[in-house]
Every structure is written in structure tokens, then in C-alpha cells.
Amino acid sequence: MNILMLSSTFPYPPTRGGTQVRTFNLLKYLSQRHTVTLATQREGDVTDAEIAGLRDCVDHLAIFERPPDSATTGILQKIQRFGRFLQQGTPPSVLNRYSVEMQTWIDSWVEAGKCDVITCEHSVNEIYIQSHFQKQLKTIVNVHSSVYATCRNQLATGISENSLRDKINLPLLRRYEQNYCAKFSAIVATTEEDKIQLQEFNPNSEITVIPNGVDLVSFPNRTTDLGGHRLIFIGAMDNLANIDAVCFFSNEVLPEIQKLYPDTTFDIVGSHPVPAVLALDQKPGINVIGRVPSMVEYLHQATICVVPMRTGFGIKNKTLEAMAAGVPVVASDRGLEGLAVDGASHTLRALRANKPAEYVTAISQLFDHPHLRLELSHNGRQLVETEFTWDIAGKSYEQVCLGKE
């Protein structure tokens, strides 16, 4: 089978963020069994060595320059993009990454009959799919998270960067998601929650849930519990949901924990920390570490991994990676989305918390009880091994591509 995968995000190395992790690992699985062509965009910090590394993973690699970021474009262009959003329904964030050169190449590749399947790795790539493609080949969109549900959730939780803009955008995003899904023969979501949201827009659509996975070689189970009072958060630190999570935890939870356990530290590990995150480094016990060569080394040194997400839909790689590494997890409903970790009918695999007092209680329990840490460590790792590997996800994705889901 000849597969054309589209990813405006350069997916290598698969340590930069959640989009890269999911895209690369599904690509890696498919390329072992099929002929895979990847069309992607090169961002400013992508090195020639990284391009060579990605090229080794596919049969054909087509790279295009990423268009200038909207932050560097003029106000007139931004107004034009918003006008197009109102008229045609395509959000400025999608138009911002649109490459005419990439579109021309994709059109030619499809018209020449060089692929049997075309996949969009993240919904932002839907812009390259012409409505008539469905007549020629199977079209798949891999929705990492519903843009409408995410915007609605950010407004509901009060963490929107611009609430007036997002209130205007919300009905437009609903229309956008409904319209773009109609161009695809199959839709993939990461959680049942997202599937329900997307099914509401497109009752007749074929929607398959394929959760994220973990590379168990890159995230081995830790051999010892070092104890102590070390907390960690992992994730790309230019992501709005992650920024909100660490700011919320640092300001509203950590000071209360430190009253009970004064030596508590909080490591924030992940690439591209923005000024709001860097400023947290001035607070007692907080270490903003940035990008590291090995995330698992930092996880293994931690007592607990916290995932205090208040927004952001879809399954969280950070939660799965911590579980794979054998680190006990305390997380919010958003951080545990798509995972059966607690409740009467499930083995206890993580502790759930949403309010500051709930975090204090859960973290205190784990600090004080090594046997509880061991229980979560064992059960979390077992869950990942049996349900959340990239091999399992890759097989499911292959079935969707083959039309056998």
C-alpha cells in the first residue's frame, strides 16, 4: 500500500512534543510494512542531521519551508485571515501554516496516482485535502484533539488567552470542524470523549479511537524508588495547556505542599519554556529545566509526576510516559482522559485531583506511603504494556488505512 502522510509539524526527533511523538511513531510502524511518503515543513530549529534521521524512516520525504509565523506578519494580513475565517470557515491558525508550494506538490502526487491512502497527521493538515480526493483514494484525518472542544473548555476554565476572540471563534470552530470532517473517508480520534464530540458533528462518519502509545525501550520501568519529595511535570513548555498547568500548580498547589514538606522541589522539564514559565524558576523549590536529551532520566529521579491539566483534549503522552517509567502519577480529569485508572471497576493506577486541596491530599498520601507508590508504579506500567504501546496503536492505524477497522 502506498501511503502519503501530511504533517505540517516536523515530526523528528519524536521528543519535541505530543504531535511529533504520535506522528513519528505511527509513521514508523506503517513504514515497516508499506511504502510511506511524508510531506512536512521545516521549522527554523530543524537541523540537517534531523532531516537525515527522518529521511531514513520513510521511502520518500518531501520538505517545504514553513511560512512566516503570524507574529511576524502585518495587521492587514491578520485581518485578511480572520475575514477568510468568517467567510470560508478556515481558522487563522490553520491558514498561518498553509504552504501553496506544498499544496501544489500534494495535488500533483495525488493526480499522478502515487498513493492509495492520504493521512492528515493532526487536523491542521486538512486544508490540503481537496473535496474530490475522496473519489480517487481513501482520505484519513488523525484528530489529535477537537479544536472546538478545546476552545470551549478554555473559555469554561477561564484560561483563554483572549476570551473575546474565542467567544467569537467558538461557533466558527464548530462549523469548521463539521465541514472539514466531511472531506474524509475515515476519522481517527485519541479518546472516546473526542469521538463523541466529532460524532455529534458527523453522525454518519466512520470514527475509530486509537489512543497514543509509549516506546517501552525509550521509557523503561525504573528499578528503584528514591523516595524524597521531588515532583516533576513534563511537556512542551510553549503549549498553552501546559503553561496553564504549571502556573496553576506552582501558584496554588506547591506552596501548600511546601508548608507540609518544606524540602519539596518541582522540576518543569520540556522544550521552549516561555517567559511566564521561566519566571517560575524564581519561586522556592522550582527548577525550570527546559529541553533535555533524556526525559526518562528525570522521570526516574522524581517521586511523583503531576499532570495538573485544566484544558486540552485528547490522551496525554506525558501521563503514559510517566506510567511507563514506573513513576506514580497525580493528575486531573484532563490529564487522565482516555485512561481507566480508578473507580470501583478498575485497578488503582493513578490518583485523581482537580482542586488544590485534592492535590495536597493525593501528593501527601504518596509522599507518606511507599507501598502506595509501589502499587501505582506497578499498575501504571502494566496498563501501558498491555494497552498503550505504539505497536498496538500502529496495528489499529494500519487497519484504518486498509479499510478493515
For the regions a language model picked out, list residue spans one by one.
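Acidic anion/phosphate-binding donor-loop and adjacent secondary structure
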Residues: C151-R152, Q199, V214-G228
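Carbohydrate-associated surface elements
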Residues: E193, I210-G213
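Nucleotide-activated donor-binding/catalytic signature segment of Leloir-type glycosyltransferases, i.e.
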Residues: Y261-E297, Q301, T347-R349
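Short hydrophobic beta-strand element within catalytic cores of glycosyltransferases
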Residues: K318-E321, P328-G335
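A short, well-ordered alpha-helix in the C-terminal region of glycosyltransferases
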Residues: Q365, L372-T386, S396-Q399
